[in-house]
Amino acid sequence: MKALLALEDGFILEGQSINGHCESSGEVIFNTGMTGYQEILTDPSYYGQMVCMTWPLIGNYGINKEDMESEKIHVSALIVKECCRNPSNWRSETSLPKFLQEYNIAGIEGIDTRALTRHIRINGAMRGIISTSITDPNDLILRVKKVPSMEGQNYVTKVAPNSPWVLYGQCVVPADIKEDGSFLWKQNKIPLIVYDYGIKWNIIRLLEGAGFDPLMVPPLFSLEQVKASGAKAIFLSNGPGDPGTLIDEIQIIRELMEYYPIAGICLGHQLLGHAVGGTTRKLTFGHHGSNHPIKNLATGHIEISSQNHGFCVNFESNNDIEVTHINLNDNTLEGFIHKTKPILAVQHHPEASPGPMDSQYFFTRFKEVVLLKLGC
């Protein structure tokens, strides 16, 4: 079935719908990963975005339950050159087209993804729309101009939980919070409050592997509630949207900084940046992929990282902050620590899923910071 992709600047591409009649809109971005499409589709950080995969064949190893990063697909649409309908892999349980259809997510193939990627790289990420029903490009362009811009959008409210929860295997289970606000933590584990702005499940697994007992909570979980829970440390997750819109969340982080060790990844990194006096700005086309080189300034080592963000943190002048990592493609900030408080954060994704594992030491480093704060 014929489908059109229109960008807000009038750029039009024609392709075929992967799963029948569809219409979807959002911010069009590109991802340079060769694999990992299931993890990308189910990453809540992609909420409100239409993802163009630069690798020409997507879906050849299918879909399985174990590679989910959340309970469902969060992207607005998937854009590929060719979608494989007959996957071949011993772990495959269903195909990519069926997976998209199950969650009613638009998909388009037959697109010149190289031309689209070049256009975005030169002109920046922009609003787009896919439709099988509207065949007049001019009508599509008029409609896409009504789509909200990513800047100024609080999409955390679309993906964050309303109440505390824990992860058992692949199941999200409501947490048993007592009437006094306390929680029964696991023995011999560090009690950890995780602010869930749209967390990926592999972050939780690696926190558990590092010796933490993570309890996921809503974005506006107060300092008083944290104290009542008995937690010893705070973790700020990834998530979608514009970090500058999360005023209340940033204020809560400022309060938490006075009492607890804190680590943040991706959106968590950006919110911590705001909390300690920095700002954020939108990147031209963002960093999305599993092959981004960064430099660890403490060791001098180069790490290949998994990334997914459209905003970056800036510190004009802050003597309390030490930059720990930079992006070697554009020299943007990739990580920082606070010189006097137990705070550390990275913009990239040390949990990978998908991507390389060069930066997974971040979780054990956070544990070391927490134990030092606790006097252990």
Swiss-Prot record:
Keywords: Amino-acid biosynthesis, Arginine biosynthesis, ATP-binding, Glutamine amidotransferase, Ligase, Nucleotide-binding, Pyrimidine biosynthesis
CDD domains, sorted: GATase1_CPSase
Sequence segments annotated as region (CPSase): 1-187
Catalyses which reaction(s): hydrogencarbonate + L-glutamine + 2 ATP + H2O = carbamoyl phosphate + L-glutamate + 2 ADP + phosphate + 2 H(+)
Protein name: Carbamoyl phosphate synthase small chain
Keyword rRNA-binding appears in the UniProt entry: no
Domain of life per record: Bacteria
Gene: carA
NCBIfam families: CPSaseIIsmall, PRK12838.1
EC number: 6.3.5.5
UniProt source species: Lawsonia intracellularis (strain PHE/MN1-00)
